[in-house]
Amino acid sequence: MELKDYYAIMGVKPTDDLKTIKTAYRRLARKYHPDVSKEPDAEARFKEVAEAWEVLSDEQRRAEYDQMWQHRNDPQFNRQFHHGDGQSFNAEDFDDIFSSIFGQHARQSRQRPATRGHDIEIEVAVFLEETLTEHKRTISYNLPVYNAFGMIEQEIPKTLNVKIPAGVGNGQRIRLKGQGTPGENGGPNGDLWLVIHIAPHPLFDIVGQDLEIVVPVSPWEAALGAKVTVPTLKESILLTIPPGSQAGQRLRVKGKGLVSKKQTGDLYAVLKIVMPPKPDENTAALWQQLADAQSSFDPRKDWGKA
């Protein structure tokens, strides 16, 4: 056997960090992948790169490889490592080779530790009305399975029935313990995180825990006052428009906003004065009478003043 120069195979230096080595591995793996590369030795080069990555991507295994590389010219190393057949070992033989050269204690000390699985995040769309009460939801996602090189080898479909609590907010994260990818060497599974996305509503805008709704009113309703029916998340209510209301005025309806464990928000009705269509002759005459009666009123009196 002969000890390969894994750093040369990857085109990196022994002092390079894992990020640099990982970048080199991905580049070479794409270059020599048998399904992509046209080079005659692509398959052999791909296996060689994968073998180098398996060793250099593991901190303990890389340290042991560096130690073996430093001793490659020592007589004792040559007696135990070389068999004269000119073949190189692969990463699967690494434990046995290292322990035969440096002793059983070294092998025991490099046992790979238990590693926690990866977390997974998925976005869950929730309608505003659904935030008022706890509800059940069936979610589906793909559980990635990683190979020895840290790359996704396959994805396994998975379905869960979950409870979405009342009062969830936009961007809130819900943890489902142990529903992520499996751990390695007895390590715990990762978690699944549900990231809540409140779907846009055709009527309501969210402002913190409060809701805003634009309420169209006629000029005479704004001037004289009125009672208009306004929807909320639960039911419709009768909203009082005070006389002399202005466009853009906000009327507060207490306790009709979003509900959470800590507080209940309010609903703000934002008035929008809507003019009727182009008036006929009789209607125009009435508008003119109103204009004459309010001739002293100048809506632009303070316009542009600090």
Curated annotation (Swiss-Prot):
Cysteines joined through disulfide linkages: none
Subcellular location per the Swiss-Prot or TrEMBL entry: Cytoplasm, Nucleoid
Gene Ontology cellular component annotations, sorted alphabetically: bacterial nucleoid; cytoplasm
Molecular function terms, GO-annotated: bent DNA binding; DNA binding; identical protein binding; unfolded protein binding
Keywords assigned by UniProt, alphabetized: Chaperone, Cytoplasm, DNA-binding
GO biological process: chaperone cofactor-dependent protein refolding; protein refolding
Alphabetical list of SMART domains matching this protein: DnaJ
Swiss-Prot/TrEMBL induction comment: In late stationary phase, by phosphate-starvation conditions.
Cited CDD domains: DnaJ, DnaJ_C
SUPFAM superfamilies: Chaperone J-domain (SSF46565), HSP40/DnaJ peptide-binding domain (SSF49493)
Domain J: 5-69
Pfam short name (any one): DnaJ_C
UniProt entry tagged with the keyword Cytoplasm: yes
Superkingdom of the organism of origin: Bacteria
Stated role: DNA-binding protein that preferentially recognizes a curved DNA sequence. It is probably a functional analog of DnaJ; displays overlapping activities with DnaJ, but functions under different conditions, probably acting as a molecular chaperone in an adaptive response to environmental stresses other than heat shock. Lacks autonomous chaperone activity; binds native substrates and targets them for recognition by DnaK. Its activity is inhibited by the binding of CbpM.
Other remarks on this protein: It binds to curved DNA in a sequence-nonspecific fashion.
Record-given protein name: Curved DNA-binding protein
